[in-house]
Structures are given as structure tokens and as C-alpha cells.
């Protein structure tokens, strides 16, 4: 009985109609019995009004009622067994869906931080196909409703690093001898947990993450909890705010982790590039083949820097304009996608920022960048150019041009950088003699060049690369060679082995395989998981 009462409205209406019909049937039966008894009474007998029924009459009525009750019980039992069957189609039907843009098919390098919105349910009714769906590098679908969706994605890698081939010390351009740490260790290097999706409207998207670098245990920015939120008005304009990388070079456009090496740049790219900061930005397509991104931020690197250490100028500006003549270039470096026709790209980047000594991060924090001379010395170092002279402020300007070609698993990609540092301010006003020892401006330029080939399509990739910095205080360079194995023929799991040779590296910290001032060979082997 409870099952029937809990059924849907249509079932309850059928049940009530059945009960009414049975009651009418009982009343008619009783009337027929009484009529039959009346007809059997002799004509000379007195009316039976007011007399109780005889024992035979009562027995006949009870027998009839019992028979009707048994029929009611059987009908109720049959109705109860049919109720779940009638409800099954209603619960098993998936909600209608509206096809949405799938960013995993885009050549936009920012798609790794965009949610997958393949289907938008019309109702909140459960749909098995909407939950647990997996999209490589964009994770598993946790929720999918008409009011929003959420996916979870994890990126991590374990690395063996051997720097024993490096010289134990180096001499900077000012004659100072400094030591080089020669590491050999194994680290679960980085763990990133990402939550991404949309809320209320598929155009309103969020990207939240926790990010840790275990090699920098104890550092101020060893663990980062960050993210951003944006609204896409159309294909030409997305407005967003939060923490992201300044798009000053190709590797900071948003294509991480789709690099040839695992989470490791060439030293020239590391030397010139900006880093992550808080701010606002716009991006979109100018045409189908030209896209742009412009960001206004706090400083060049916010990791490990509190708001109390920032200046109040809010004048860090970075931009990227990318042209793909064929309309599609693909994510990241190398031709894993095996383009069957020649595809190319050309990018132009520009960044400027007024930097202050207080707004600079600690030098060993991961993913940070600092203003350095080409020998690796931070320009805010006290007494750097002359005794008693300390630079506290400087203006950073950097222009970058990159280009690339891809064809049938082969790729060649290069980048050139120009950087200017000027508008120096000092802790104390230098004397005329001291000013003669301090350069009015600094100019450095350099390049990186990488070539790669898919030896076995979707499985084995070989690459080589080199970079060089032409600076006023040194001309460091590096070369590297490596191989990537993709055992499942996708970018979810990768085993990378790489050898590199450093010559007076001007950059380096515990999160990367190269060391500051390093000269010599380095080997590292890395197992990467990105789902």
C-alpha cells in the first residue's frame, strides 16, 4: 500500500478509481442479495422491515465480502509490482542536452585552464553519462547541472636529478667566487590539484588550484592556493581576474605543461621571462587566425610576496599577439598531433613593469623571476656597482618574437628576446663618482631554438635545443637533448629523460634542473602524470 501511495500522481489516480469501482460493486451486490431475499418471502408474510438478518443471510454476505476483499488484495499486489516498472522509464531517461564548445579540440594554448562544457543538462535529473566523464588533461567531471559544472584535474611528476657533473663554484663578472650546490636526489617535485568549470552560465568560468613544489620545502611560496574567474562575452572578448602568468613569452601564454621538457625551460627563456602575478586581463580572437591577450598586474612575480611589500602603481603590463596562418597550430611545443599539412605560428610579446626591491620574491621560490645581470647577479644586491650604492627601483621592458613550423611529427621552434633595464633609483643618492660606476641602463638580448621529431607517432619523441644570452656582464648558453615516451599514446602519462650542458647559467633554483652559475652536465629523469 505504501509503495502505491508513494507512486507518481497518475498511479495514485488509477488506484483510487479502482477502489471506488470495487465499493460500488459491493453496494450493488448487497442490494441484489436483499432483493433476492425479498423475492423468496411468501406473499402472505409480513414485511421484513426491522427484522435482523437470518444466519444464512449473514453467512452469504460475509462470504461475498470475503470474496471481494480477496479480489481487492490481489489487485493491490499486482499494482504494487507494476509501480517500479512504470517509473523506470522516467528515471532512466537522460535529460536532454545542449551541445557546447569543447575546448579540448582548440588550438588556443589557454584551453588547459578552461572548463569542458560539452553538455548542459536541461534539468537537474541525474544522468549517468554526465558524471565521471573524462577528458585528457582536463580531468574528471564531478558535477554537471543546469546551474554549473565542475571537473577535477591533477598534475604531478616525480624526478631524479643528478648535478654531480657541475663545477663546484663559479666567478661572477665582479670577481666574486660563489659556490654551486651539486645535487643528486629524488623528489615528488610538484603537485597541482585543479578545480575548473562554469557556474550559472557557461560563459562564467572559474579555475581554482593548489600548487606545491616539494623541492622548496620551507620557502614562503612552497604552497600556493590561487585561481581566476572570467566571463566570455564572445569569441573576441573574455574578461578575467585573479592569478595567472604574464604572457610576455611563449611559455607563459598558458601552454604549460605541453613543453618538450618536463616543467623546465631553456636558461634564456628563464632569464628573460616574466612570471605569475595577480591582476586583470582580456583575451580573445581578432580573427579566426589571430588572437590576443593583454594583462595588467601588480608586479612581475607575486609568488612569495605579500601585499604589504607591493608598490601602489599597478603598472605591470604584458601582452601577446599570435598569428597562426593556417588557422590551427596546436598546443605547446613539438608536433605530437602529427599535422599532415604544414602549419605555422608567429607571436609578438611585450612586457613592461616598474619593479621595486621590496616587491621582489626570494630568489629560491619556484616559478619566480627576478631582475638579474647576465652573470646571474640580482641588480638589487647592495654595493653591486660601487661601494655604498644600492639600486631600489628599476623599469623592466622586454620584447619577444617567436615562430614555429610543424609537419608530420617534425617541429622547429625559436624565440628571440630583447630586454632593457633603466630608470634606476637608489637607497641613498650616489655621488658623482659613484654614478660614473653605475650604468644608466642595461641591455641584454638572446634566443632559444628547439627541434623535435616524433620517432614513433603518438609514442616516442626526440628533441634537441639550445639558448644563449648576449649580455653586458656575460654570455651564458646551454644545450639539451631528450626523449619523451608516451606509453598510452596521449599526453596523460610521459616519461622524460634529458641531458643538458650549462655554461655559466645566470638562473637556477631548487625547482629546476639547472643551478645558478652552473657549468657542466646535468641529467634528470622524470615521470609525469597530467589528467
Task: List PLM regions with ranges.
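N-terminal secretory signal peptides that target proteins for export/translocation
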Residues: 1-18
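N-terminal periplasmic/intermembrane-space "pro-region" immediately following the signal or transit peptide
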Residues: 2, 34-157, 164, 289, ...
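Outer-membrane beta-barrel pore domains
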Residues: 125-126, 165, 339-352, 356-531
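Outer membrane beta-barrel
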Residues: 135-172, 177-302, 309-329, 333, ...
Amino acid at each position: 500500500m505504501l509503495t502505491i501511495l508513494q507512486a507518481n500522481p497518475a498511479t495514485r489516480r488509477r488506484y483510487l478509481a479502482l477502489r471506488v469501482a470495487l465499493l460500488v460493486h459491493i453496494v450493488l451486490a448487497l442490494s441484489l442479495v436483499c432483493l433476492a431475499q425479498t423475492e423468496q418471502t411468501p406473499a402472505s408474510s409480513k414485511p421484513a422491515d426491522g427484522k435482523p438478518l437470518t444466519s444464512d443471510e449473514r453467512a452469504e454476505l460475509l462470504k461475498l465480502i470475503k470474496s471481494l476483499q480477496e479480489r481487492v488484495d490481489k489487485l493491490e499486489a499486482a499494482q504494487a509490482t507494476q509501480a517500479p516498472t512504470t517509473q523506470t522509464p522516467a528515471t532512466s531517461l537522460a535529460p536532454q542536452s545542449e551541445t557546447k564548445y569543447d575546448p579540448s579540440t582548440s588550438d588556443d594554448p589557454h584551453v588547459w585552464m578552461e572548463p569542458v562544457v560539452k553538455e548542459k543538462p536541461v534539468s537537474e535529473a541525474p544522468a549517468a553519462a554526465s558524471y565521471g566523464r573524462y577528458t585528457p588533461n582536463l580531468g574528471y567531471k564531478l558535477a554537471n547541472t543546469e546551474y554549473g559544472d565542475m571537473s577535477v584535474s591533477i598534475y604531478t611528476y616525480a624526478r631524479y636529478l643528478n648535478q654531480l657533473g657541475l663545477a663546484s663554484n663559479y666567478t661572477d663578472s665582479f670577481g666574486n667566487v660563489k659556490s654551486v650546490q651539486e645535487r643528486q636526489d629524488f623528489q615528488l617535485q610538484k603537485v597541482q590539484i585543479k578545480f575548473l568549470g562554469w557556474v550559472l552560465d557557461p560563459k562564467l568560468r572559474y579555475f581554482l588550484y593548489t600548487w606545491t613544489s616539494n623541492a622548496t620545502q620551507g620557502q614562503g611560496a612552497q604552497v600556493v592556493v590561487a585561481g581566476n574567474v572570467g566571463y566570455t562575452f564572445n569569441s573576441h572578448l573574455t574578461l578575467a581576474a585573479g592569478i595567472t602568468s604574464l604572457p610576455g613569452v611563449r611559455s607563459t601564454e598558458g601552454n604549460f605543461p605541453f613543453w618538450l621538457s618536463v616543467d623546465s625551460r631553456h636558461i634564456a627563456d628563464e632569464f628573460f621571462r616574466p612570471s605569475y602575478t595577480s591582476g586583470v586581463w582580456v583575451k580573445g580572437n581578432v580573427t579566426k587566425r589571430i588572437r590576443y591577450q593583454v594583462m595588467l598586474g601588480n608586479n612581475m612575480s607575486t609568488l612569495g610576496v605579500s601585499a604589504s611589500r607591493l608598490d601602489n602603481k599597478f603598472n605591470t603590463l604584458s601582452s601577446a599577439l599570435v598569428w597562426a596562418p593556417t588557422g590551427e597550430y596546436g598546443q605547446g611545443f613539438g608536433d605530437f598531433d602529427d599535422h599532415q599539412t604544414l602549419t605555422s605560428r608567429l607571436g609578438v610579446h611585450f612586457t613592461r613593469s616598474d619593479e621595486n626591491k621590496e616587491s621582489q620574491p626570494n630568489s629560491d621560490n619556484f616559478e619566480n623571476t627576478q631582475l638579474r645581470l647576465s652573470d646571474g647577479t640580482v641588480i638589487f644586491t647592495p654595493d653591486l656597482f660601487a661601494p655604498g650604492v644600492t639600486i631600489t627601483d628599476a623599469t623592466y621592458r622586454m620584447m619577444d618574437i617567436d615562430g614555429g613550423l610543424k609537419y608530420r611529427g617534425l617541429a622547429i621552434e625559436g624565440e628571440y628576446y630583447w630586454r632593457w633595464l633603466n630608470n634606476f633609483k637608489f637607497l641613498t643618492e650616489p655621488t658623482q663618482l659613484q654614478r660614473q660606476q653605475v650604468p644608466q641602463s642595461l641591455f641584454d638580448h638572446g634566443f632559444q631554438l628547439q627541434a623535435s621529431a616524433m620517432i614513433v607517432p603518438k609514442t616516442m619523441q626526440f628533441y634537441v635545443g639550445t639558448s644563449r644570452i648576449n649580455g653586458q656582464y656575460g654570455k651564458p648558453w646551454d644545450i639539451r637533448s631528450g626523449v619523451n615516451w608516451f606509453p598510452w599514446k596521449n599526453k596523460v602519462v610521459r616519461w622524460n629523460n634529458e641531458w643538458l650542458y650549462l655554461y655559466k647559467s645566470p638562473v637556477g633554483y631548487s625547482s629546476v634542473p639547472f643551478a645558478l652559475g652552473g657549468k657542466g652536465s646535468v641529467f634528470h629523469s622524470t615521470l609525469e602524470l597530467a589528467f
